[in-house]
Amino acid sequence: MQILLLTILICSSFLFPSSSFASHIELRPCVEIAHCVREEWEENNIENPFEEIKTFIENTPRTEIVEVDGDYLHAEATSKWMKYVDDLEVSFQPESNILSIRSESRVGESDLGVNQKRVDLLKSKMF
């Protein structure tokens, strides 16, 4: 019985990739527009925009970077009162200077504009 359970556990670990968020270049589109924001723009004013935005995210309260892979970053932002977790992704394509940001709530239909405010704040720090 224990061998069967162990086999099932090991096999099920192959069903889901270790990072189900992005391809590390192109961020997924937002499916539910009410609680997801995805924007991208060309960034020519800052020498290393990915490092700049990474440093800003590292210093943002209640936000923890959980993965960095080259020019891709995945962070989790936790709300102050209800402790909801939102996923924040940043991808930079150095060959085209395109910086992409995606912020999505994990639960609920609406985020009351929190993800848009987060993306706007990150954009404002880049200009």
Ranges and model annotations:
Residues 16-127:
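Ser/Thr-rich, low-complexity intrinsically disordered terminal regions
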Residues 4-13:
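Sec-dependent N-terminal signal peptides
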